Amino acid sequence: IYTGQLVRDCANLFERKQELLTEWSSVFESGAGIIAISNAIENTSVVDIATTNFEEIINSEKLNGNVGDHFAKPGANDRIWNSLQKHCMKDPQNFIDYYCSEAIALASEAWLGPNYQVTAQVNRVNPGGKAQNAHRDYHLGFMSGERSASWPLHVHAMSPYLTLQGAIAHCDMSIESGPTLLLPYSQLYRRGYIDFSNEKYQKFFDKNAVQIEMTKGDAVFFNPAVMHGAGNNKTKSVKRMAN
């Protein structure tokens, strides 16, 4: 867990920046696989404006029949697919203010190197929304275990190096509201893309996954092969939004 101010300080000092990038790369590859950054977006009013933009997009898309998530039950959540482009088109200045975060830049560079490309989707888990099924993401995570098994093992090992997963909190996230469940070190399990839907593995995840409370503007970044899933939103009023 790191403070946003430490990250911003390191961003402007070459040696400290390189030390931080090296540390994070090691965490993503062979450590817990996860870092958290408090106050990753320094000015939370930027987050508030983005939240308003996202809510307006969600409401507009609902009128056109947009549905939520392939890893959650219908009605549990709302999604904005390709929120990056939609955000930019709706409010270019807020888009710039939001994505100029040093935390986003350094976390991405630590794992992907320079010249990475950003994609984004919004997930808003509504009050009473049930947890997602635990899963991995990109690129082998969006198919059955039987299908992913048709790729050789070295592809399973390579795939997580092509993407970094991250999320910015758009509201305060208590444990009761169900912040993302994560299974530290699970990126080290080479067969994870094949076995993640296995009932035995799902039960292991349920028993051992961890959560951290987040406040608005905090961020979490993790190796996409880390088993994860949105938690149960047990609140009656919190619409838990992350981008």
Write out the residue ranges for each language-model feature:
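A structural signal for short, well-ordered beta-strand segments
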Residues: 120-122, 166-168, 242
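A short hydrophobic beta-strand segment most commonly corresponding to one strand
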Residues: 184, 236-243
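Beta-sheet entry/capping signal
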Residues: 32-35, 115-116, 179-180, 218-220, ...
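Non-heme Fe(II)-dependent double-stranded beta-helix
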Residues: 1-146
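Catalytic micro-motifs at enzyme active sites that drive phosphoryl/nucleotidyl and oxygen chemistry
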Residues: 23-25, 153-156
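Double-stranded beta-helix
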Residues: 147-151, 157-229
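Asparagine-centered strand-capping/turn motif at beta-strand->loop junctions
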Residues: 232-233
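Short, solvent-exposed loop/turn segments at the edges of secondary structure
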Residues: 131-133, 161-163, 237
